[in-house]
């Protein structure tokens, strides 16, 4: 059954009262202002409203068998709520059904408790998207190639491109991340335009943060540039006003306009160079934390009139009043049509999308890779070669040269130093954290892509693109061998022990061979002092916390001839080491954000905090923070991606070998 996305309002679908009168007010059922505000903005999202008013989803849904409902469907609930709000001849209504089914969208949500509006929005979008994919999968029944397109993705989905260019040889490496919204840092900005400029500002990778160029085969100075590869039909922007789990709120005014033009931020590879948007909704938060205060929304109806929707109280407003508010979430709709050529991005499996919500579309839209929930910003990193989206390579995440048989350091390597992240979203890998909280993808969930955000116990969500970034196996094999050509390790786009959608890592190559051809010593791999045997006989090694004792000795020992900066005590070395730590921290946290780990931590910590607050009452803030960290530390550490641990080991290894004056 065909369906073409209709971006403008279809007045014939609206009831007379809803077409000429104000929006339907939604009664507050007990701290449900966040839910009411999100529902009002979704209701007045034209393409989604048109889709729901024609019952495109429920008419194909499998939740009813022989007229009896088998289970509650999140998309059916949303569709029915939106259609009712645009059809009934009432002044106010109560969103009873969706309020009573909160756990369908997020297990940790609780009726009667204040929740974050942006978090709820992402869960709703994610649930509807995944429901569409489930129905689509049933319809295909494994007989045809399956892609990750849905009506939700066609409405809210876009893609960001991250390009790293070697400043020595000019070689470029491109990577794409799908998004469902964008989260912007506002602490150092005064306007949405300024925040966007900072988000897409180029970055020079130099010093301790150099990039390993495959063409040059060495560490080089490079330029990293973020840009928009595919602009979404509906652009959702979150202004990151909340500073963290234990932080406050950024309550300053951030200016924004009715018109938003993204041409300055578009990728050169995009077929859509001039996307223009017009504001149609905002959500405002008044108060000092996401767990308290009050949410209300402004929406523009089908006749272009602005209304303030404050739960059941709806009043006529003006554009000037809207632009004067301290907005938390902005909703923009494209005012110029997306070119047909911009809808021809190649999917991860190279197939063309012909369906939306399981229905064929007259204008198929292709995206890069399937969405796996949001962990959007994202979730995983998708990669592609410039000019060839189907066969692609990710950015090289590893800085040093490969060395085989180097066991990665375990969790204790990251136990204390990973404190700040560069939400993204972005965009913004699905990493399950068993803390009773489901993370959206995107966003990022992230779907959420995140850039330079802090990961302190609730992070300020800077430059995060709620992505639904998803990692895609490029389909290319990367071969790594030892320096003498022996014992090569072959990885199909993934690190050992990781899923096939993670970035391939260079295992360590053996640096010293034995004289008799016996086993190489792990001890001989350590540059700061050699503890290995010379006859090729391997020594037994004990392990503590996942790190071999001989390995630890090798990494931390030093000699007079080749002093290791990790052990030097002079002030100059200490300062240089601190700079190295900051570089490692920045890269590690950027990776944690892009893979969705940061968002998992954020949502899990929020849920734990609320639960403990309810159970203990007025617990001291410092005690609450300590207990929360104790509760989640071990489980979250175990979820840190293995490729990140291996990369940090490699880089620390290279640092320990380097001679410093």
Swiss-Prot record:
GO molecular function, one term: cysteine-type deubiquitinase activity
InterPro entries listed in its UniProt record: Papain-like_cys_pep_sf, Peptidase_C19, Peptidase_C19_UCH, TF_EnY2_sf, USP_CS, USP_dom
Region (Disordered): 387-406, 449-558
Keywords: Hydrolase, Protease, Thiol protease, Ubl conjugation pathway
Active site (record annotation): 33, 294
PROSITE patterns linked to this entry: USP_1, USP_2, USP_3
CDD domains: Peptidase_C19E
SUPFAM superfamilies reported for this sequence: Cysteine proteinases
Biological processes per GO annotation: protein deubiquitination; proteolysis
The EC number(s) this enzyme carries: 3.4.19.12
Positions with biased composition (Basic and acidic residues): 449-461
Any Pfam family hit: UCH
Comp. bias (Polar residues): 462-475, 545-558
Source superkingdom: Eukaryota
Every USP domain range: 24-335
Catalytic activity: Thiol-dependent hydrolysis of ester, thioester, amide, peptide and isopeptide bonds formed by the C-terminal Gly of ubiquitin (a 76-residue protein attached to proteins as an intracellular targeting signal)
Family: Belongs to the peptidase C19 family.
Function field: Recognizes and hydrolyzes the peptide bond at the C-terminal Gly of ubiquitin. Involved in the processing of poly-ubiquitin precursors as well as that of ubiquitinated proteins.
Protein name per Swiss-Prot or TrEMBL: Ubiquitin carboxyl-terminal hydrolase 25
Organism taxonomic ancestry: Eukaryota, Viridiplantae, Streptophyta, Embryophyta, Tracheophyta
């Amino acid at each position: 059954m065909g369906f073409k996305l209709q971006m403008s309002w279809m007045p014939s679908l609206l009831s007379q009262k809803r077409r000429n009168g104000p929006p339907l007010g939604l009664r507050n059922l007990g701290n449900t202002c966040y839910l009411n505000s999100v529902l009002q903005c979704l209701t007045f999202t034209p393409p989604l409203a048109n889709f729901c008013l024609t019952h495109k989803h429920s008419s194909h849904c499998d939740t009813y068998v022989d007229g009896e409902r088998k289970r509650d469907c999140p998309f059916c609930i949303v569709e029915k709520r939106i259609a009712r709000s645009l059809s009934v001849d009432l002044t106010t209504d109560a969103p009873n059904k969706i309020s009573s089914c909160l756990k369908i969208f997020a297990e940790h949500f609780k009726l009667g408790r204040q929740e974050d509006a942006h978090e709820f929005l992402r869960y709703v979008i994610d649930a509807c998207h995944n429901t569409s994919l489930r129905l689509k999968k049933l319809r295909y029944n494994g007989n045809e190639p399956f892609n990750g397109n849905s009506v939700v993705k066609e409405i809210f989905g876009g893609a960001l491109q991250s390009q790293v260019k070697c400043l020595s040889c000019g070689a470029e490496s491109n990577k794409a991340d799908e998004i469902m919204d964008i989260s912007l840092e506002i602490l150092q900005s005064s306007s949405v335009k300024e925040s966007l400029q900072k988000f897409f500002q180029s970055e020079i990778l130099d010093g301790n943060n150099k990039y390993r160029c495959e063409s040059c085969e060495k560490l080089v100075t490079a330029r990293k540039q973020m840009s928009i590869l595919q602009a979404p039909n509906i652009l959702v922007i979150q202004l990151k006003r909340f500073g963290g789990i234990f932080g406050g709120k950024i309550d300053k005014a951030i200016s924004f306009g009715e018109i938003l033009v993204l041409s300055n931020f578009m990728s050169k590879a995009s077929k859509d160079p001039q996307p223009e948007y017009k504001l149609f909704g905002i959500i405002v938060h008044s108060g000092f934390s996401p767990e308290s205060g009050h949410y209300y929304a402004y929406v523009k109806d089908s006749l272009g009139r602005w209304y303030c929707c404050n739960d059941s109280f709806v009043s006529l407003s003006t554009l000037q009043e809207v632009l004067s508010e301290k907005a938390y979430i902005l909703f923009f709709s494209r005012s110029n049509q997306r070119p047909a050529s911009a809808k021809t991005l190649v999917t991860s499996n190279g197939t063309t999308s012909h369906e939306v919500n399981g229905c064929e579309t007259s204008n198929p839209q292709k995206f890069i890779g399937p969405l796996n929930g949001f962990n959007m910003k994202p979730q995983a990193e998708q990669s592609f070669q410039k000019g060839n989206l189907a066969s692609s390579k990710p950015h090289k995440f590893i800085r040093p040269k490969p060395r085989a048989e180097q066991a990665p350091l375990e969790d204790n390597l990251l136990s204390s130093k990973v404190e700040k992240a560069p939400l993204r979203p972005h965009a913004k890998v699905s990493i399950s954290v068993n803390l009773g909280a489901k993370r959206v993808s995107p966003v990022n969930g992230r779907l959420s892509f995140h850039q330079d955000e802090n990961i302190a116990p609730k992070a300020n969500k800077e430059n995060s693109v709620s992505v639904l970034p998803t990692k895609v196996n490029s389909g290319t094999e990367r071969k790594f061998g030892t320096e003498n050509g022996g014992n090569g390790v072959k990885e199909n786009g993934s690190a050992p022990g990781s899923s096939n959608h993670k970035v391939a890592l260079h295992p360590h190559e053996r640096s010293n061979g034995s004289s008799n051809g016996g086993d190489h010593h792990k001890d001989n791999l350590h540059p700061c002092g050699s503890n290995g045997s010379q006859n090729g006989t391997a020594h037994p090694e004990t392990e503590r916390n996942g790190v071999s004792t001989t390995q630890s000795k090798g990494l931390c020992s030093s000699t007079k001839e080749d002093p290791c900066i990790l052990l030097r005590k002079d002030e100059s070395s200490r300062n240089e080491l601190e700079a190295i730590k900051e570089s490692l921290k920045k890269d590690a946290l950027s990776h944690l954000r892009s893979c969705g780990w940061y968002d998992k931590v954020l949502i899990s910590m929020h849920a734990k905090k609320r639960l403990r607050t309810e159970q203990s009452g007025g617990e001291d803030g410092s005690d609450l923070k300590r207990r929360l960290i104790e509760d989640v530390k071990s489980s979250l550490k175990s979820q840190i991606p293995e490729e990140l641990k291996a990369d940090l080991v490699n880089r620390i290894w290279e640092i320990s070998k380097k001679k410093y004056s």
